Design a protein with these regions (language model features):
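Short intrinsically disordered, low-complexity coil segments enriched in acidic
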Residues: 1-6, 107-116
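Ferredoxin-reductase
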Residues: 1-73
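Gly/Ser/Thr-enriched, mixed-charge loops and adjacent short helices
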Residues: 65-108, 114
């Protein structure tokens, strides 16, 4: 799973908590650091990942934040999938596992390789 965060001062801490939770359930996470949402989608394709999570307040005021989540390339979670995630979270229906964290910035140089 590709994970990134926006520029707000609190987003990185939220991303770290998200990553810890994902790893504890067996997800392998590739942290691409400070990013724009389109960069996370770009990294999903170029790093061949099945899912993304972007910690961002998007267009909201400072103090608000959320997580844009996507599965399958180019698709974000639909309301039904978000309801399922909410149910899993509120009812603590987590699976246990041991995921791996990788920190990667290779997605940043990929666009320049196509410039002639």
């Amino acid at each position: 799973m590709i994970v990134g965060h926006d520029y707000r001062s609190y987003s990185e801490a939220i991303k770290k908590a998200l990553i810890n939770g994902l790893i504890s359930t067996g997800c392998n996470v590739e942290d691409i650091g400070l990013s724009l949402s389109p960069t996370v989608y770009f990294a999903q394709f170029n790093l061949n990942s099945d899912a993304i999570a972007m910690v961002t307040a998007s267009h909201n005021e400072n103090g608000w934040t959320g997580v844009k989540m996507g599965i399958k390339k180019g698709l974000t979670h639909a309301p039904e999938e978000m309801s399922e995630l909410k149910d899993i979270t509120l009812n603590k229906k987590f699976v246990n596992g041991k995921g791996v964290l990788t920190v990667s910035y290779t997605h940043l140089t990929l666009p320049t390789k196509r410039i002639v």
